[in-house]
């Protein structure tokens, strides 16, 4: 019993120390002119054309690890930027559709693979990826220009402007803090852990 209490205390103390040890302009930067969000949230901005975003998703699984570690009641959203690649605007719209119909996990990796190999020449190519991965043609055609999808396209674009996103992947916590990738460990294993712990620590600030 004493050992269990000690371990529980040590774990809680460790989390507290992690939050306190985060240093502004090292592990994170404060986003100028932004207020803390009303509800706890983590937002990732990414592009299907971005090789680092692809590595984050498919190799290092950083978004998944962050999502799995978040406290109850914390939202995690991934939003696409449309300033990279020839089909980036179409991909932002397609991602909005995926969000609207809860098809993110069906199409995310296939879209990454296609964009990384420059296989996307038009919205028709994107449409085929959706169909090949479990979204019906009727769902795609009926939703891609719908009111809900138009709203999500605008939301993604407005948030990119709001946070002045210039590069990806880019993570924002509670609308006020941005994870500073350059300030984290450079070796792979420590980098992944530090990234996740930085997000968790910023949620406590």
Tell me what each language-model feature is.
Residues 36, 70-71, 87, 162-166:
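Extracellular/periplasmic catalytic domains that process cell-envelope and extracellular macromolecules
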Residues 4-13:
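Sec-dependent N-terminal signal peptides
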Residues 133-205:
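C-terminal cap of thioredoxin/glutaredoxin-like
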């Amino acid at each position: 019993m004493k050992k269990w209490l000690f371990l529980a205390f040590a774990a809680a103390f460790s989390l507290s120390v992690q939050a306190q040890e985060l240093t502004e302009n090292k592990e994170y930067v404060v986003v100028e002119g932004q207020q803390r969000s009303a509800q706890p949230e983590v937002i990732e901005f990414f592009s299907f054309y971005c090789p680092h975003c692809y590595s984050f998703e498919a190799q290092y699984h950083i978004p998944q690890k962050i999502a799995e570690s978040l406290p109850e009641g914390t939202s995690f959203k991934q939003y696409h930027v449309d300033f990279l690649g020839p089909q980036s605007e179409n991909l932002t719209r397609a991602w909005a559709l995926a969000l609207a119909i809860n098809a993110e996990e069906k199409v995310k990796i296939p879209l990454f693979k296609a964009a990384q190999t420059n296989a996307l020449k038009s919205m028709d190519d994107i449409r085929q990826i959706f169909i090949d991965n479990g979204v019906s043609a009727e769902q795609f055609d009926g939703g891609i220009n719908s009111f809900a999808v138009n709203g999500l396209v605008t939301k993604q674009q407005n948030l990119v402007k709001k946070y002045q996103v210039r590069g990806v992947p880019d993570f924002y916590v509670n609308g006020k803090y941005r994870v500073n990738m350059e300030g984290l460990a450079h070796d792979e294993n420590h980098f992944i852990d530090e990234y996740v712990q930085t997000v968790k620590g910023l949620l406590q600030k």
